[in-house]
Amino acid sequence: PPGPTPLPIIGNLHLVDLRRQDKSLMKLAEKYGPIFTLHFGFQKVVVLTGYEVVREALVNYTEEFVDRPSIPIFDQIQNGNGLFFSIGELWRTTRRFTVSSMRNLGMGKQVIEGRIFEELHFLIEKIKSFKGEPFTLPSFNCAPINITFAMLFGDRFDYKDPTFLTLLRLIDEVMILLGSPYLNYFNFYPFLGFLFKTHKIMLKKIEDVRVILRQYMKASREDINENSVRSYIDALIFKQQEEKNKKDSLFHDDNLMASILDMVMAGTETIATTLQWSILLMMKYPEIQRKVQEEIGRTVKAGSWATYEDRKNMPYTNAVLHEVQRFITLLPHVPRCTAVDTHFRGYFLPKGIIVIPSLTSVLLDKTQWETPHEFNPNHFLDAEGNFVKKGAFLPFSTGRRNCIGESLAKMELFVFFVGLLQTFTFRPQPGVSESDLDLTVPQTTFTLRPQPQATCAVLRE
């Protein structure tokens, strides 16, 4: 495909803002069209932008674009194992097993909803303890992260538990490092690794997480039986023992560790950050917050929590949550590569070429959304105020590599968000007005996080 002429050594890196690659890619698409070639250093990459092109690639050509490329930092961490950056039979088997295990553990079912209500209770008690004084947005993270941990480890943590706090800190530090331009440079020029420290710091932190995970794996090994599969770790270890005489079982220690690590990382940051954004956007737009609270008041019985099923009677709230996920473009893109030689929209893409399907360009596609750069819940409502599904709503990606935890994330987000707004009104801290809340320059980590901000939670009568 067409694209800018690469310079020696740097390729087209001078045209890309590494902190907001997604914005740079959309700008280049205006000049070169929805499919173009870019050079990151010596790496040739094909970029796909806009709803039509990205959806066609991920849905109609799902087998062709199913692989992940080799990325130096993830090669060093996972060595081709796990869920996120594995390919081929290892990926297919691990993913299939993970999806069925998570379903058996209640993902997307009512049993997990009970856990979410329990966690909501703890979160609300925590927020009440601030007594209306300002607290930071990451204070919300403990609840959604605990839901993921309960599925992985078999039980929730107390919010003051030292292991819980250590894991939260390490995940946070790893996510921040993943957004660092230096890490990008290491991925483009791994042979210059000796010049960069970031990847070494990162590998050390990942090892600190593994030390904790090994303790849980050891405990699970010691008392596992088929009647006591209480967690994802239990399920993996039970599967490993089932296949221990199988010569080329894919459930070896390295793949088990990599899979758990992927779930710890990807299954926590995304939902926690989305919840932070949802509260920040309610602080920014108090009239939208009020309309959500009015709908909750009409629909949910006083003294009980909204269930996920209630969303069908809460079109405005449902639209607001969808718009939060569209507007924040949380995970701008995760690279793919072609599994086979591929002909796509008149272009030949050889096997193994890196492909970037830009999810940001879909969520902000001006042919699909009336006001793509504004927070506007009407994107998901018809003239009568009914909720409307939109094909271009793809924050979880789509096709064979879509997000494994999508059904869990949607349920958590709805139950937590509604429960919080049922109990509190969220306002900026004293001396800060709605217009002071900056949404335009997110913090680039593995995801796009809101800038550090504080909120005040005022208890509702």
For the regions a protein language model found, what residue spans apply to each?
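Cytochrome P450 substrate-recognition site 1
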Residues: 1-16, 21-115, 134-136, 140-149, ...
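Conserved cytochrome P450 K-helix E-x-x-R motif and the immediately C-terminal K′/meander segment
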Residues: 13-26, 30-33, 211, 215, ...
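Cytochrome P450
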Residues: 39-46, 106-118, 127-150, 158-166, ...
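Conserved cytochrome P450 catalytic core segment spanning the I/J/K helices
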Residues: 103-107, 145, 180-181, 205-275, ...
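Central I-helix of cytochrome P450 enzymes
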Residues: 144, 148, 153, 205, ...
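Cytochrome P450 heme-thiolate "Cys pocket" and heme-binding signature region
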Residues: 266, 345, 383-413, 440-444
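Cytochrome P450 heme-binding "Cys pocket" and the immediately downstream C-terminal segment
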Residues: 286-288, 406-446
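Conserved cytochrome P450 K-helix/beta-meander segment immediately N-terminal to the heme-binding cysteine loop
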Residues: 357-385
